[in-house]
Amino acid sequence: KKSKFWSNDFNVIFIKASDMSVKCDVKETRVHTMAGTAYGELLQDKTFWDDKGNLYVACNTERTDAQSYTEQVGNLLRINKGEFQFDQNYMGHNYSAGKLITSTYMGNNKAVLYIQDPVHTGAAGWGNNYNCWFAILDLATDQRTEVVYNGTHLPYSLGTFAQFAVVRDGKVYFATNPEKEAPGIYIYDIATGNVTKGLSIQEGYSFRRLVPMEREKLPAVL
């Protein structure tokens, strides 16, 4: 049964912050919905800016074979710097499968994606299963590469209402909630592409959100 929440498009309103006036209202019809949750950016990374100031928005669309609202496939849309509409010539993560749960910019024109896809992970189905995995997306070529450690993929994880990737000081930290081993953190070095194993926590516990304990270092403005 099709969910009552589904629509075939969504609107983006551009608002001038200084006086709250509406600049314009834009309808997007290529995808169904932004990849938002109840808490939005307070909990999960759904949008990011690249080094050129372009804004990327994670979006999802109902799969043609969907049996529930959860079963979606994701894309990235882009609003170019200085523009007030989506770039109609750009459709990122242009793949036939993979629901976008979070999207985080890691620099060098690449993004970290946390993706739900039970076929890819071999899980029993959608919903509360170990059906999520990490990939790095090249924003220029749209090449999607799964993150690996010691020659194999990171453990497939349980948890979609969560933030499991954090970028800080040249590294990406990944949290995993595997089915058959202790939850753990893996560390990806952006400069070299090497992945090392960080800490593990006791089985029976699980990660829900990685939160840096200090602000990201930003360049001084002169």
Give the positions of each predicted feature:
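Long, acidic/polar, low-complexity amphipathic helices and coiled-coil-like
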Residues: 1-42, 49
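Short, conserved, GDST-rich strand-edge loop motifs in beta-rich repeat architectures
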Residues: 1-7, 57-73, 113-130, 177-179
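Beta-propeller blade signature
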Residues: 2-21, 70-84, 128-141, 185-192
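Beta-propeller fold detector
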Residues: 21-32, 81, 85-95, 143-152, ...
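Repeated scaffold domains used in trafficking and secretory/extracellular systems
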Residues: 33-47, 94-108, 155-165, 203-216
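Long non-transmembrane domains of secretory-pathway and surface proteins
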Residues: 43-57, 61-79, 84-92, 98-102, ...
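Intrinsically disordered, low-complexity segments enriched in Gly and acidic/Ser/Thr residues
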Residues: 87-181
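Blade-level signature of beta-propeller repeat domains, shared across WD40, Kelch, NHL, RCC1
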Residues: 178, 194-222
